[in-house]
Amino acid sequence: MPKRTSLQNMGEAGEACVRQYLEEQGWQILAQQWRCRWGELDLVASRAGELIFVEVKTRSGQGWDQKGLLAVGIQKQQRLIRAAQAFLSQHPDLAELACRFDVALVEQRPGKEGVSYALADYLQGAFELWE
């Protein structure tokens, strides 16, 4: 089995941070790191007739890409939309729910007792399905 990189570990820690946030908001997590030929859906959750596909970007500093926001450009959005369509084709019982694409930006923060992760921004409806 390949060894985990520090970037993979940081990404998973960021996803765990967002997962906890969503659960505290009453969302039920349906899938995490769901993969298909189009890519990966970091988190899929539902609540009260809504379904969200959440892309999580975790950064250790400000960086050049606005805490990860610029990493979710048009091509990434198209891959996420295709992955969401694949997810829905495998879960037809969810296909009638209102769907939304959110982006969560997580910061890695150094501290006296090691690093911690905090939700820096959560963008509901960060992009829409368009053809």
UniProtKB/Swiss-Prot annotation:
GO terms for molecular function: nucleic acid binding. Pfam families: UPF0102. InterPro entries: Restrct_endonuc-II-like (IPR011335), tRNA_endonuc-like_dom_sf (IPR011856), UPF0102_YraN-like (IPR003509). Transmembrane segments: none annotated. Belongs to the UPF0102 family. This is UPF0102 protein CYA_0708. It comes from Synechococcus sp. (strain JA-3-3Ab).
